[in-house]
Amino acid sequence: ESVNEPLLDESLLKGSKIKKEKKGIYGETVWTLKNGVKVVVLPTDYKKDQVIINLSMDGGRTLIATEDLPSFEDNIWALFLRNCGVSKFSGTTLPKMLAGKSAGASPFISNLSHGISASSTPKDIETALQLLYLTFTDPRFDENEFQIGIQQIKAVLPNIQNDPDFQYQIEKDKIFYNNNPRVLALNEELLEKANLATIEKVYRQMFKDAAGAEVTIIGNVDLETLKPLVQKYLGSLP
């Protein structure tokens, strides 16, 4: 079942022009947009049906207060990504929106950086850029979907905790990280502390300004076709 509705209202996009263009030593083209986003494009036909897009900014988990980290434990962050969707589209509606297309985008938060990873086929690159734009500017926080995910984790938690490999990893982390409070282990107490309001607070802070972000686009792309799409979607990031 597909949903025939546009992902976004393109008339609301302001866009911004390319302020500077230069060629790199590896055949890449570097565009600097007026909104401060740097775009590095490396056309390659190594995989003819693939385009990989990565938007990255400095910060990552270093920007998250220790008391907020339980909401970003790996399993909880994964359920947020899986269940909550984007804009007005839920995690179950979005795949129907994308029926017949090969495109996706997902936010990431690593230790020192955060951003959005996206990918598509060459023909669906505009959809991937739309999803990246929405993930940045119009994230979706659905308390009901989030709680469903939390209950799913609670249901399997005893099995996870009984796994010897899981216990070994906990003990190893305690020794290796000297009981650092920023290194988390999944348990009942952590699940009680995790909440969607904290995820939303931190997420909106991290993704409020794209100035200084670097976007790499690698794959089977045509620069002249790509340029107006970059200006339209990446150029509309705040």
Predicted segments, located by residue:
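A common structural junction motif
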Residues: 134-141, 233-238
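Proteolytic maturation boundary segments
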Residues: 1-66, 211-238
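M16 family metallopeptidases and their MPP-like homologs
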Residues: 1, 40, 47-82, 86-138, ...
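Edge/loop elements at the starts and ends of beta-strands within beta-rich repeat scaffolds
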Residues: 206-208
